[in-house]
Amino acid sequence: MSLNFLDFEQPIAELEAKIDSLTAVSRQDEKLDINIDEEVHRLREKSVELTRKIFADLGAWQIAQLARHPQRPYTLDYVRLAFDEFDELAGDRAYADDKAIVGGIARLDGRPVMIIGHQKGRETKEKIRRNFGMPAPEGYRKALRLMQMAERFKMPIITFIDTPGAYPGVGAEERGQSEAIARNLREMSRLGVPVVCTVIGEGGSGGALAIGVGDKVNMLQYSTYSVISPEGCASILWKSADKAPLAAEAMGIIAPRLKELKLIDSIIPEPLGGAHRNPEAMAVSLKAQLLADLADLDVLSTEDLKNRRYQRLMSYGYA
């Protein structure tokens, strides 16, 4: 896979371009009287070291860019890599099937679970079909239908959060966007089965929270979670989206800050360079965390789950 490099990764991109050029030359003429393999190996080591150096000191705005990386694994990528026998379920049984939310039954290490997550899409046509990962009310109602089904059949619920926010279109508002989100918040707090939520990319406002009320809430290392995008915050406070880097630093949108505030439980480390560099390794780490979380929750009774979830929600906003 050819990687897309972000602005702050340009020094890495330049090294990788040199490696690609040397590799191409080596393939074209195997009779060259120079040791290209040795030089390629040296450059690869240099690239890894440079990547470590850059990623050891990332700011909030750089992490926000990584969370939106076009090659970052999405919900269906993790379903393919970490689960078995996925059977997608569609529709809210009231209006439509919103493709920005995907869900269905799968097996995690042989155990039946209900998976629900945002799905953005990669190519232009798919992005439009998925509405860039911004669900309409029918998406959240589909999610709620699947959660209630999971509760009926005593299946744990696993959600993957990756959205810039709920779709703010006129049609979505007319069909009850705010009501759909509010209802999900209420109903998720009452579910009698374990709920594990993981932010895998962008966690944008109520659009994220509508599938984010859980017994365990995790974030990938380079994901974000906030009430508004840095650009939106900058436009309000400074009347300019150009101040987004400043807003990102001030808002506390990154995983370490949110864990410090006790808004999340765990930070799942990403491969060097981000999840898109090695989706398979990322899926292994994610699966291990999900299994550990479910093991912790399995010992709790239904009432304990509900009470702990309620206390968690009520603790938000207190120092």
Swiss-Prot record:
Keywords: ATP-binding, Cytoplasm, Fatty acid biosynthesis, Fatty acid metabolism, Lipid biosynthesis, Lipid metabolism, Nucleotide-binding, Transferase. Residues 35-296 form the CoA carboxyltransferase C-terminal domain. It catalyses: N(6)-carboxybiotinyl-L-lysyl-[protein] + acetyl-CoA = N(6)-biotinyl-L-lysyl-[protein] + malonyl-CoA. GO terms for molecular function: acetyl-CoA carboxylase activity; ATP binding; carboxyl- or carbamoyltransferase activity. Its EC number is 2.1.3.15. Pathway: Lipid metabolism; malonyl-CoA biosynthesis; malonyl-CoA from acetyl-CoA: step 1/1. InterPro entries: Acetyl_CoA_COase_a_su (IPR001095), ClpP/crotonase-like_dom_sf (IPR029045), COA_CT_C (IPR011763). GO terms for cellular component: acetyl-CoA carboxylase complex. Transmembrane segments: none annotated. One of its GO terms (biological process) is fatty acid biosynthetic process. It is an enzyme of class 2 (transferase). It is found in: Cytoplasm. The keyword ATP-binding applies. Belongs to the AccA family. Component of the acetyl coenzyme A carboxylase (ACC) complex. First, biotin carboxylase catalyzes the carboxylation of biotin on its carrier protein (BCCP) and then the CO(2) group is transferred by the carboxyltransferase to acetyl-CoA to form malonyl-CoA. Acetyl-CoA carboxylase is a heterohexamer composed of biotin carboxyl carrier protein (AccB), biotin carboxylase (AccC) and two subunits each of ACCase subunit alpha (AccA) and ACCase subunit beta (AccD). NCBIfam families: accA (TIGR00513), AccA_sub (NF041504), PRK05724.1 (NF004344). This is Acetyl-coenzyme A carboxylase carboxyl transferase subunit alpha.
